[in-house]
């Protein structure tokens, strides 16, 4: 158990490291086995300098890139630059996406290689990580309007799932149009109240839900989401 300089919002594990984003404008990086602190992306000072981010909300790794969604941009850092005791430089930042607090989520469609990212402005932004080049601010390759405010998303065998506010709180969504295909707010005997962050691993949906008495995490077999 550790304390951060701001409220933690996103976490991921990849290649024996744990990455935690928080509103203190940093992404903390730990050794996954010893939990020893290694370094951080962002120096804790709000800004857009070469070693800065603004409030960090989510983090994802894909093909050697660490991707961090902060309050304004998606920041890209080379994974090979992550070294203990060294603050890595931002490789490149996306175009300005609008300065908004909220819950953000990112996932890569392995079939197309596109990065999908939620935004509180009722939209899902698309990027092409394979085309990232140093010194060139990547622009969105697409944008999907969404019925509700999306919080998080993930793919499972080509199917896109999105958590959000509104009546349809957890849905399967068409990855090309953003249209809701099926509402899974009720899964078996579980009715989600206020789901937010989730991931799908080992054929299982792990999803946080804010319920009356606090927050719980469900583990639901994907076979239940037909």
Predicted regions mapped to residue ranges:
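Short loop/turn segments that connect beta-strands within beta-propeller blades
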Residues: 31-36, 78-85, 128-132, 174-179, ...
């Amino acid at each position: 158990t550790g304390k951060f300089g701001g409220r933690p919002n996103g976490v991921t594990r990849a290649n024996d490291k744990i990455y935690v984003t928080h509103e203190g404008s940093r992404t903390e990086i730990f050794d996954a086995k010893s939990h020893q602190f290694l370094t951080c992306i962002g120096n804790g000072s709000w800004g857009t300098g070469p070693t800065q981010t603004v409030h960090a909300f989510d983090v994802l790794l894909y093909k050697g890139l660490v991707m961090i969604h902060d309050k304004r941009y998606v920041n890209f850092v080379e994974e090979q630059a992550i070294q203990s005791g060294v603050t890595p430089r931002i490789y490149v930042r996306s175009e300005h996406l609008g300065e908004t607090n909220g819950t953000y989520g990112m996932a890569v469609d392995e079939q197309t290689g596109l990065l999908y990212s939620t935004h509180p402005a009722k939209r899902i932004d698309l990027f092409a990580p394979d085309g990232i080049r140093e010194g060139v601010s990547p622009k969105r390759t697409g944008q999907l309007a969404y019925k509700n405010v999306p919080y998080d998303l993930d793919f499972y065998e080509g199917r896109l799932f999105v958590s959000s506010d509104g009546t349809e709180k957890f849905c399967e969504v068409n990855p090309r149009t953003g249209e809701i295909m099926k509402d899974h707010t009720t899964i078996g005997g579980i009715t989600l109240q206020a789901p937010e962050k989730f991931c799908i691993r080992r054929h299982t949906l792990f999803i946080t839900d804010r319920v009356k008495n606090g927050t719980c995490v469900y583990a639901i077999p994907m076979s239940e989401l037909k």
